[in-house]
Structures are given as structure tokens and as C-alpha cells.
Amino acid sequence: DKKRLKFDGSISIQNLFQFLIEKGWQKGEYNAFNQLISLSKNGASVTLEPGCQLELSGKILKNVHQTCTETYEHLHELQEYAKLNNLCIIGLGFDPISKREDIEFIPKDRYRIMREYMPKVGSRGLDMMTRTCTVQANFDYFDEKDLIKKFVLANRLQPLVMALFSNSPFKEGSHNLIKSNRIHTWQDTDSERCGIKKEFLDQSFNIEKYVDFALKVKNYFLKINGKHIDTTSYSFHDLVTKTPKEKNIKEYNLTVSDWINHLSTIFTEVRLKSYLEVRGADAGKWEMICALPAFWTGILY
């Protein structure tokens, strides 16, 4: 019927997760409604993006051949489920058919807060959450000097990678002459936390400058007593240096986990965590999924 897989039902994400559990995956996180929203296996995980897009996060591996093998094994699992249920797997950077209002948001507190905040800072944030799909690659670094070299180079090359891997020319059933609707969507999502920042292109960049940048970005939420509390009125710097007016936030002591969560809500084209994450490519067909980490491996190492 040309519709996305629903979150729950006889043929759904929940049903797919049960199928994957039979293939050796273990149950992971549950939402507030006791519904399964992630799986894990041998250091890898399967999670859900806001519009039920599947995300495989592979385990740490030594080379791109191992990464490709792991990816193909998972894709074959999905393909088997798809054939059993007359489904089609689409490898594109943007949903070619569905309208935004037709897509179901998964019930997850973090995504609820983002859903309410996105329209305040851009016109396409909800499209980003529900209609985009990407291939990303993560790389280690030896020390700060090595990190800076890789980070700056990766930022400088991102426009080239975006062009090479552009693969989303269709929107709502028609070709709209935009080679990557995914990139077009990101350009008006949230300029504060997205894109390529000027300071990221300079060889004088260092970790302190990235921290300064991240501190200025609005914080989506704090998890207090098991609940996600909306903090989008505050940057992380505000939470550290000012006294919030809300009683539950004011009485809460920030932790390292809050900072780590905050870093995960920064959506620049190259993201810095305990590893380097390159994020500029559209999703594509199977061989292109492996091509992206191979491309970056040849450049960064």
C-alpha cells in the first residue's frame, strides 16, 4: 500500500523486533508504554529514529571489511522479514512517497520534546525527524592533534561527500529537481546545532572550541527521576551558570551523563564524541553503504 511500516501491529516494528530476537538479538530499551524500542547483539544495536526508521549501530571493528560483513548480515535479516511480509526496503536519503502528516512518531519522551521544539527553530525539523535517512561512519583518533587534523579535514570535505552520495531526488511521489532532499531538509532544521561551522574549518580548532560551541547550544532535556524534562529554554551553559526558574531543574545536579546526552543532540555534519562521526551522506543501496566508510578510511588514515 506504499505506506511506512507501523510501530505496532501484526506487521510492524514491534513484530520485526520479535523476528530479530529469534535471530539472536537481545531486547534492549523499552519506552514508557513498555514497548520495545531497541535491540542489541555482540556490541551492535538496532534503534529507531522518530519516524520508525531503523538504525543499525555496528560494534567497534578493525577494518571496513568487517563492518561491511556485519552490515550485510543485518540487511539480509531485514530482507528475509520483508519477503515474508510482502514489504519493500528502500535505500534513499528521503522518504519518496509519504507526507509528513502520514508518518507515525514513535512514543518516546526524547522525541516528544524535539517534536515540540523543532518548529520554533526551523521549517523542516519535523521532516528531518521522520523522512530522512543517512549512512554515517565513526572513526577513532590517537590524541588531540590527530583529532584536529581529522576533524578539520572531514568538515572541509563534507560538501564533496554530500554531492557524491546524494540520493534523494524524490518527494511525495515526484521528482522535485533537488538531488538530495535530505540535505535540503537539514538546511532549515536548526542552524544553531546543524551544518558546518566556520570555526570547524580552521586549523586553529581544538577541543576547547568544540566545548564552547556545544555549551551555547540549547539543551533538549534532562532526565530527572526517570522522566525527560524539557529544558529547551536553556543552553547547557545556562544550566551550568544560571539558576533555572523551574523547581525540579533548579534542584537537580548536572552529571557527566547529561553532558554526553547533550552532545548526542548536536547534529553538525561532523560530530565529535569519544570518536569522530561523519554524517553527510544520504542512505543508498547496499554497496553504497559500505562505500562510505571505505571512502573515509582511505582519507582519514
Describe these PLM feature segments.
Residues 6, 64-66, 147-149, 162, ...:
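Short helix/loop capping segments that flank catalytic or ligand/cofactor-binding pockets
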Residues 55, 136-138, 277:
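Short aromatic/hydrophobic contact patches that present stacked aromatics
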Residues 63, 142, 284:
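Glycine-/small-residue-rich active-site loops that bind phosphorylated ligands and cofactors
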Residues 22, 80, 156-159, 163, ...:
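Short, intrinsically disordered, mixed-charge
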